């Protein structure tokens, strides 16, 4: 082996990849109840400032219509006898280019103009949906009265700048109000978007050279081509700007960072007290507002096909909040049985002065906008006072826990079975909260490194595993778990540790954990608060059962487990277990009654009717009859209908007892039997 190769080999061994250089293990007290992972600093959006940019793209169409007329005029000019007699060599070329390119391109731009309009939601009081722009010889825009430099709408801090008339200003003000309920400030940015170069001097120069027929036609053709190229570019840029606005992106045609900085600087004096811009007012910060989509963009279409782009710049409160992810830490005993406090929300925001706190939705970090430093979120409906906090997760964070007797009252303590190895991802990348019920070996496996020397032994308990200075993609493996380490170009999060409360000790409030009997259920490996609610049992219910000596064994435990399964199933439908059991009982009783009724109808139909008829006949026989008045009736004898006749034809009957005639075809209908 050469000396150079030996030196390289020694250097490689000296810089060998070691797991201890990459993996950091930070033990945490396993009795603390919660781990509070810092997410970021947060501020609430209190209001919105609207910048309104009006684009009158009808001006472009006017230029296109005028160019169309000039092209037709030049085509007629080349076909005139005077021009033909001049015998210009470019005559055929000009006529061919007009027919094959110029006119077709103009018609295509007309179609593109209407396509841009069709993309945008029209105003209810604007043009009809089926109205289209067409080339004609008249001015497509009716003359409109322009308003002055200032035209106040509402209060002085809501005036609009620009060249629109009063009707448009009022309509835009109402439109901005409906697009965001927090709207209080509106400013229109002067329209400088559609700048069409004027060729008046060039046209006048051409008219002076009109006597030179061949030179005039060539120069006129070059001017038309240049104008068409410019209009084509304007339509392309405007189409991209509309598409970007519909996708909530700001196109440079609408607003550049420099222009946004100037407009925000001009209206800063009108920003309400205690509100400020989401970023410090510097030119370098304007890119963050535009590129990170902090500024929202809308586009609308007004009457006469005018387009307005509305930019919403949030105004934030000066109060800052620290956002934490609340992760429950199970306190485990024997046989995988653990107690855990289920938090009321996944995220908590605490003001920097600790006086207020808020509860955030589970998707708050994704729903909020991220600036270079802070999260921007819309304020929730309720902002709580810290001194009046009653729930366990916020009291532990604020060090408000006073006694262990209140744990059962203020905390949603649950008991369940957990996996012996739990690794819960935090901070997105290369950070895990671990809960281990036994000593565990963690092996680092990298593609170009030996795993024999990359073994980390972690004692049973709770802590944080953090990957630092990860220069390659590796895997951390135990006997049952695998964690992926990612190589990051930069740190997406500034990780900071929060000192946990040392005064709170969950084990002091759960001295009877080993005595609690729980139902046999699947082990938990997820520490999400919503998952824990359905996969564990309440401590208060277990203690009531234990105090009532309701400890079940064997078959009783299986029956209880079946009830628990039913309650767990209906719990997914947000139905109380008692209500569901009552409904099931009513359905069962109804089915039993229906079954008995069907058996009666099949086996002994008419039994009840016969019994009722007998009772009624006996009652009637005991009542004295009127001799001078008889009445016919029908009775059932031996399951057949019989006619009861006490006389006939209204004549007086000499029989004191009724006569019975059987309605039977086999008998002689003239035979009458007495009822003795």
Curated annotation (Swiss-Prot):
<keyword id="KW-1032">Host cell membrane</keyword>
<feature type="glycosylation site" description="N-linked (GlcNAc...) asparagine; by host">
    <location>
        <position position="548"/>
    </location>
</feature>
<keyword id="KW-0472">Membrane</keyword>
<dbReference type="GO" id="GO:0055036">
    <property type="term" value="C:virion membrane"/>
</dbReference>
<keyword id="KW-1168">Fusion of virus membrane with host membrane</keyword>
<keyword id="KW-1043">Host membrane</keyword>
<dbReference type="GO" id="GO:0020002">
    <property type="term" value="C:host cell plasma membrane"/>
</dbReference>
<dbReference type="Pfam" id="PF12259">
    <property type="entry name" value="Baculo_F"/>
</dbReference>
<feature type="glycosylation site" description="N-linked (GlcNAc...) asparagine; by host">
    <location>
        <position position="87"/>
    </location>
</feature>
<keyword id="KW-1170">Fusion of virus membrane with host endosomal membrane</keyword>
<keyword id="KW-0732">Signal</keyword>
<keyword id="KW-0812">Transmembrane</keyword>
<keyword id="KW-0325">Glycoprotein</keyword>
<dbReference type="GO" id="GO:0039654">
    <property type="term" value="P:fusion of virus membrane with host endosome membrane"/>
</dbReference>
<feature type="glycosylation site" description="N-linked (GlcNAc...) asparagine; by host">
    <location>
        <position position="628"/>
    </location>
</feature>
<feature type="transmembrane region" description="Helical">
    <location>
        <begin position="577"/>
        <end position="597"/>
    </location>
</feature>
<feature type="glycosylation site" description="N-linked (GlcNAc...) asparagine; by host">
    <location>
        <position position="76"/>
    </location>
</feature>
<feature type="glycosylation site" description="N-linked (GlcNAc...) asparagine; by host">
    <location>
        <position position="505"/>
    </location>
</feature>
<dbReference type="InterPro" id="IPR022048">
    <property type="entry name" value="Envelope_fusion-like"/>
</dbReference>
<keyword id="KW-0261">Viral envelope protein</keyword>
<comment type="function">
    <text>Envelope glycoprotein which mediates the fusion of viral and host endosomal membranes leading to virus entry into the host cell.</text>
</comment>
<keyword id="KW-1160">Virus entry into host cell</keyword>
<keyword id="KW-1133">Transmembrane helix</keyword>
<feature type="coiled-coil region">
    <location>
        <begin position="169"/>
        <end position="215"/>
    </location>
</feature>
<dbReference type="GO" id="GO:0019031">
    <property type="term" value="C:viral envelope"/>
</dbReference>
<feature type="glycosylation site" description="N-linked (GlcNAc...) asparagine; by host">
    <location>
        <position position="266"/>
    </location>
</feature>
<feature type="glycosylation site" description="N-linked (GlcNAc...) asparagine; by host">
    <location>
        <position position="469"/>
    </location>
</feature>
<keyword id="KW-0946">Virion</keyword>
<feature type="signal peptide">
    <location>
        <begin position="1"/>
        <end position="16"/>
    </location>
</feature>
<protein>
    <recommendedName>
        <fullName>Envelope fusion protein</fullName>
    </recommendedName>
</protein>
<dbReference type="GO" id="GO:0016020">
    <property type="term" value="C:membrane"/>
</dbReference>
<keyword id="KW-1162">Viral penetration into host cytoplasm</keyword>
<dbReference type="GO" id="GO:0046718">
    <property type="term" value="P:symbiont entry into host cell"/>
</dbReference>
<keyword id="KW-0175">Coiled coil</keyword>
